[in-house]
Amino acid sequence: RQAEMAALQNALDAGELPLRVTHNDTKLNNVLFDAKTRKALCIIDLDTVMPGSALYDYGDSIRFGAATAAEDERELDKMEMSLERFRVFTRGYVRACPGLTQKELELLPLGAKVMTMECGVRFLTDHIDGDNYFSIHREGQNLDRAHTQFKLVTDMERKWDKMKEIVNEEVQNAKENGSCCI
């Protein structure tokens, strides 16, 4: 896992991945929706915007959106990564982002894994440091968050081949529809 954690930054540093504007907190509650049309209006919480990899935003979205349980769920057997949600999000993402490079497309699953592991480490670090960064509403909440993220990483590893297969299928479908890729 150690090599994987550095892989995206190493690829950016080597020029293998393009530097893009990234939000870095791409979860659903950072999107405002129109109450009538239910269409997205804008993205909020812009304090985390900076240069980075599109894989950071994709990965964080998968971490949050494909999880089958709340981020602070205490019953870890409820937490896994939904392959159905992974597929639907990936389909939308590759079709909405036609400028993604082949290397970015190949690394989409790794983006999900890296961002999930990173969040787990951040939650654990915050718990150890006295819960100063992430707000908590109960004792041990950040530790529970760390546990769920690590469980999610383990589930991604178990489903790794299927994740790569889904990305390949969705990229191929998007290419056939003329809505994908450099």
Q: What is each PLM-predicted segment?
A:
Residues 18, 23, 50, 81, ...:
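Secondary-structure capping and boundary motifs in well-ordered enzyme cores
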Residues 15, 29-70:
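Catalytic activation segment of kinase domains across protein kinase-like and atypical kinase folds
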